[in-house]
């Protein structure tokens, strides 16, 4: 198995990325292709003992920075580490791609180069949120701001496959993130998706309220990317606030410090359960290849686990199972599937990233990127 990793992407690149890759190669035995500027990567590798480790370098002369517009950068930087890495997957020279770089660029390049799986209209980001009974998958966490019923239906199938074949849930419970448990709650789109999922082969449990998300009420929670991303960001902010509050409490005086020492093992266990670095990254599901999007500020540990996760997706044959489940449910799938899905998906990515070249219509820009990236 070969995993390509964007050595130049992320706030802590290249040092944290390469250190994480070295740990992954040593611990998992994965063949890792470090994509980026050869001289920079070689210099970083000298800081580690890499003798006999399955590491190789694929040169890419350009870097897409975190602040750049995905569409503009992909059009102008044709030898970027993101584009080169994804092309390795396209050509079968790598089984998966991992990047902590510009999320919008990774999504756009994956969609345009790898294309979507048969039966999938839009790719979606799936994140794992911690609960008292193990992680729950939230899909979509930001790839698609506006969604149609058939797209949310497809997200449910992709989340089901993730939960079953990667996390190991025997019969994953799938729910819709909604403002009430009752079947008639929600907007017109969620009501329509509810009807279709109810008829599907999935273990559909109905609507899931926000208050039930962290109680483990479902294994997979379906949402559009707008609501999903807000949910994710609120969760991250809340976790940060709780951490700071606890730190303030336990450093207040000698009694609180003593109390901390008594419960430290339990706090460490809790911290580990909510630490994103333990999960590694978030898969971009629905594209014809395995792509893991890591957090921009990923530590070496997070990168190591993102590489591990990429391997799990390859071994789990996730894309094959997604297509099989789409085929099983094709007769009940909402019929509103239109042509031009790739360009519409790119338009969503540009909108989501908030970085767009001025003076051009979105459709013109999308077409230019689609043609130039090939």
PLM region spans:
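Phosphate/nucleotide-donor binding subsite
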Residues: 50-94
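Glycine-rich phosphate/diphosphate-binding loop of Rossmann-like nucleotide-binding domains
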Residues: 15-16, 28-33, 38-42, 145-210
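Short, low-complexity, charge-dense intrinsically disordered segments
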Residues: 363-374
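Glycine-rich phosphate-binding loop
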Residues: 88-107, 185, 190-192, 196, ...
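Phosphate-binding loop/pocket of nucleotide- and phosphate-handling active sites
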Residues: 314-317, 321-360
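N-terminal glycine-rich anion-binding loop in soluble enzyme alpha/beta folds
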Residues: 17-66
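Short, glycine-rich nucleotide/cofactor-binding loops
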Residues: 3-15, 143-153, 293-300
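Glycine-rich phosphate/nucleotide-binding loop
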Residues: 111-124, 130-138, 220-221, 225-332
């Amino acid at each position: 198995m070969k995993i390509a990793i964007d050595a130049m992407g992320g706030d802590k690149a290249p040092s944290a990325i390469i250190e994480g890759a070295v740990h992954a190669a040593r611990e998992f035995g994965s063949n890792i292709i470090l994509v980026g500027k050869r001289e920079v990567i070689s210099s970083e590798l000298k800081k580690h003992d890499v003798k006999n480790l399955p590491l190789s370098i694929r040169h890419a002369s350009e870097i897409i920075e975190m602040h750049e517009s995905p569409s503009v950068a992909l059009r102008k930087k044709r030898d970027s580490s993101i584009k080169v890495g994804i092309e390795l997957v396209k050509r079968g020279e790598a089984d998966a791609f991992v990047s902590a770089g510009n999320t919008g660029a990774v999504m756009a390049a994956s969609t345009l180069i790898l294309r979507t799986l048969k039966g999938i209209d839009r790719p979606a980001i799936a994140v794992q949120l911690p609960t008292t009974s193990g992680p729950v998958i939230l899909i979509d966490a930001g790839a698609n701001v506006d969604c149609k019923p058939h797209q949310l239906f497809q997200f449910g199938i992709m989340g089901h496959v993730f939960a079953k074949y990667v996390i190991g849930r025997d019969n994953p419970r799938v729910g819709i993130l909604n403002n009430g448990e009752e079947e008639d709650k929600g907007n017109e789109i969620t009501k329509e998706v509810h009807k279709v999922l109810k008829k599907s082969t999935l273990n559909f449990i109905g609507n899931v309220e926000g208050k039930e998300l962290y109680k483990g009420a479902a294994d997979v929670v379906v949402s559009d990317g707008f609501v999903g991303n807000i949910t994710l960001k609120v969760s991250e902010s809340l976790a940060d606030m709780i951490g700071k509050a606890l730190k303030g409490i336990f450093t207040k005086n000698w009694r609180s410090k003593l109390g901390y020492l008594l419960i430290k093992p339990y706090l460490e266990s809790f911290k580990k359960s909510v630490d994103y670095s333990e999960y590694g990254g978030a898969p971009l599901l629905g594209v014809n290849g395995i792509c893991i999007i890591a957090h921009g500020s990923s530590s070496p540990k997070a990168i190591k686990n993102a590489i591990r996760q990429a391997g799990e997706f390859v071994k789990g044959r996730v894309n094959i199972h997604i297509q099989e489940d789409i085929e099983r449910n094709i007769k009940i799938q909402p019929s509103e599937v239109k042509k031009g899905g790739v360009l519409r998906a790119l338009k969503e990515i540009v909108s989501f990233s908030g970085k767009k070249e001025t003076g051009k219509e979105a459709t013109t820009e999308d077409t230019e990127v689609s043609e130039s990236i090939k």
